Amino acid sequence: MLDWQNGQLYSTRFGDVYFSRDSGLEEKQYVFLQGNRLADRFESLQPDTAFSIGETGFGTGLSFLCTWRLFIQIAPLRTSLDFFSVEKYPLDEKELSAALALWPELGPYADELMLRWQRRVPGWNRWSFAGGRVRLTLAIEDVTRALPETHGIDAWFLDGFSPARNPEMWTLQIFHWIARASRAGATFATYTSAGVVRRGLEQAGFQVKKISGFGHKREMLQGDLPGPPPVRLAPTTAIVIGGGIAGCAAASALASRGLIVELLESHTLGAGASGNPIGILHARLSAGMNALHRFVLASYGHALALLDEKIPVDGVMRSECGELQLSFSAEEARRIGKLATLDWPAHVFRPVDAAEASALAGIELSYGGLWFPGSGWLAPPQLCVALLGSQAITLYTGRTVKSLTPTSHGWRVQAEDQRKQAWSLEAEIVVVCTGYQVKSLPALANLPLTPVRGQLTLIPATTASQNLRTIVCGSGYFSPAVAGRHMVGATHRFNDTSINLNVSEHAENLSRLREISPVLRRLSDEVSQDIRQLEQLDGRTSIRGSVPGAMPLVGELLPGLYTSLGHGTRGLITAGISAELVAATACGQLLPLPLSVVNALSPVRRASPAIPVSIKG
């Protein structure tokens, strides 16, 4: 659907070019940056505030890159930029790279974008740049689905192809969604001066005027939504409770927005489920395009981009060995069959038969399924450490929280150290990222969290099993050998909080191997037939907090009190985007997820009955 004509990228689908024949970069700067008075608005930003831009039509990303460059050049420190864009037909890596190569002056910015581009997923993508000061939320979906799902825009770039060639982007309904997603005082600019656009924006509530266009275009439109811009006061201090992946990610997201963060952990860093020797990046997608599907997919893409920043792929701390999700049962075959019909890029996943699955894995497998080439494993404790690199974060271990008390300025946290000495901290906001034990606190007692014990098993590799190159998932998971041992798991025991290793659960983990591979069946039989071998197997137990429906509890529970709880076995992929959601909500910034997903994650909607906590002076 794309072609190059006279050095310009041309869409055969819409019969239009992606950028001006005169100068694509200069046109973007004139129409969108000058048209929205961005230089003046960036320079006048107050500390600890963010400016948000919405765009209809990401295209080559040129508008985003020149906006990012301008913001970094002139915006005061301790300010940030949110850029939201919609693109139904994204360019592939080669097309995007070739297009951006036309502007070498944007090379460093384009290189950063290309690194994230290889991690894009259908639906919503959230990527951070410039040390977290610039955030891009890219919705790869139809504009009619994306626009109703966001809000809080300060300036709009109304791009896309011309109204005559792409009328679906310029309807009255689109303009009403744009107005509804805008803050008071929001502006817009667009290269077109078409009457249908002017009248539609006016009907949506914008004040519209014509000004001189760029190059051969005689006129363009700009305007604003009447009303004074809102005053936004972001918090400056935060306490995060819980030193696992969810807590460390929350601390990192808040610190990147300029908050001073104190992180409390009752044991040592990553001592709970985040302390497993390796963790699996498992993106189990539901077949229906529901909130859970959209959340897991967005989480997966965000997690891969975040890991690229934090953890090297070195085979010790992280491996991008890929994951095979096998059609081992009728139910899984139906789920995988529905997903396989989606026309998605192969770098996200692709269907494979048993023969190709076996070739990818390096051992014979009994089933085909879905191949996720970007998945793999990592060492969760190392990710915890990497997330706490900011000097704005102070870690306190051995601190057990006893109470949370609201105050007129935020929250007071009472804790005990390992010597049972009382300890107290105060901050404007508190983020709770612990396990099921959080229900001992009155403010969180009504959340639907259930303890679930999980046991994983570590099995010495054999000559045959050593050939396994990928993660294999059936009713459980089986990892390639790491330091001479495979990890297999995990059991699920609801309302069981014991932490001792159980031989019967080792046997249960091994039994899952029989169904997916002759090689693993032999390995399972060799170990399972000798009780002494079972008793000598190493492993690890952890207790997670589980919630009904598999959606974690993420968001604001009470004024200034936030949660990121119940991530379950998907925590390695869902904790990062959840941290972004909490931080963006607390700071009044553009949200990284669709509003329907945000509502599905809300702890308020699932706390029952109403939480009896009153704000004290």
UniProtKB/Swiss-Prot annotation:
Per the entry, which co-factors are needed?
A: FAD
Citing just one GO molecular function, the answer is: oxidoreductase activity, acting on the CH-NH group of donors
Source organism, top-level taxon: Bacteria
Q: What is its main location?
A: cytoplasm
Q: Name one GO cellular component term.
A: cytoplasm
Q: Which GO terms describe its biological process?
A: methylation; tRNA wobble uridine modification
Q: What is its EC number?
A: 2.1.1.61, 1.5.-.-
In this chain, the stretch annotated as tRNA (mnm(5)s(2)U34)-methyltransferase covers 1-226
Q: Where is this region: FAD-dependent cmnm(5)s(2)U34 oxidoreductase?
A: 241-617
SUPFAM superfamilies tied to this protein? FAD-linked reductases, C-terminal domain, FAD/NAD(P)-binding domain
| Catalytic reaction(s) noted | 5-aminomethyl-2-thiouridine(34) in tRNA + S-adenosyl-L-methionine = 5-methylaminomethyl-2-thiouridine(34) in tRNA + S-adenosyl-L-homocysteine + H(+)
Q: Which Pfam families match?
A: DAO, Methyltransf_30
Q: Note the InterPro entries from the entry.
A: FAD-dep_OxRdtase, FAD/NAD-bd_sf, MnmC-like_methylTransf, SAM-dependent_MTases_sf, tRNA_MAMT_biosynth_bifunc_MnmC, tRNA_MNMC2, tRNA_S-uridine_synth_MnmC_C
Say if the entry is tagged with keyword Flavoprotein: yes
Keywords tagged on the record: Cytoplasm, FAD, Flavoprotein, Methyltransferase, Multifunctional enzyme, Oxidoreductase, S-adenosyl-L-methionine, Transferase, tRNA processing
Tell me the compartments it is located in. Answer: Cytoplasm
Q: Which family does it belong to?
A: In the N-terminal section; belongs to the methyltransferase superfamily. tRNA (mnm(5)s(2)U34)-methyltransferase family. In the C-terminal section; belongs to the DAO family.
What function does the entry list?
Catalyzes the last two steps in the biosynthesis of 5-methylaminomethyl-2-thiouridine (mnm(5)s(2)U) at the wobble position (U34) in tRNA. Catalyzes the FAD-dependent demodification of cmnm(5)s(2)U34 to nm(5)s(2)U34, followed by the transfer of a methyl group from S-adenosyl-L-methionine to nm(5)s(2)U34, to form mnm(5)s(2)U34.
Q: What is this protein called?
A: tRNA 5-methylaminomethyl-2-thiouridine biosynthesis bifunctional protein MnmC
Question: Can you name the source organism?
Answer: Nitrosospira multiformis (strain ATCC 25196 / NCIMB 11849 / C 71)
Per UniProt, what is the name of the gene that codes for the protein in this document?
Answer: mnmC
